[in-house]
């Protein structure tokens, strides 16, 4: 059974409130879960203590059982000191696409032709 530690959305329209849960990865986002590990309220100020609440002992237990945190939960765990900071590197994001590369080449050719 592939386990995930992820966010389950609650609250009403335009007023989100999330539960941090341990669940089977095949279950729906807001569906059945095995254990509620904490809460996350994005509407509170970033420096508020009540913004993210987690039962760290149970989170460690589920990580030891092989549960994989989602990206957002992994960031919460990094902030809590339970997980090492992941290196986020995407070198291809800065490389222009084919069309932009062609346009840049044409522009450089025109500049070289006008300089001669």
UniProtKB/Swiss-Prot annotation:
Residues 88-116 are annotated as: Disordered. Residues 99-110 have a biased composition (Basic and acidic residues). InterPro entries: Ribosomal_bS16, Ribosomal_bS16_dom_sf. One of its GO terms (molecular function) is structural constituent of ribosome. Pfam families: Ribosomal_S16 (PF00886). Belongs to the bacterial ribosomal protein bS16 family. This is Small ribosomal subunit protein bS16. It comes from Cereibacter sphaeroides (strain ATCC 17023 / DSM 158 / JCM 6121 / CCUG 31486 / LMG 2827 / NBRC 12203 / NCIMB 8253 / ATH 2.4.1.). The gene is rpsP.
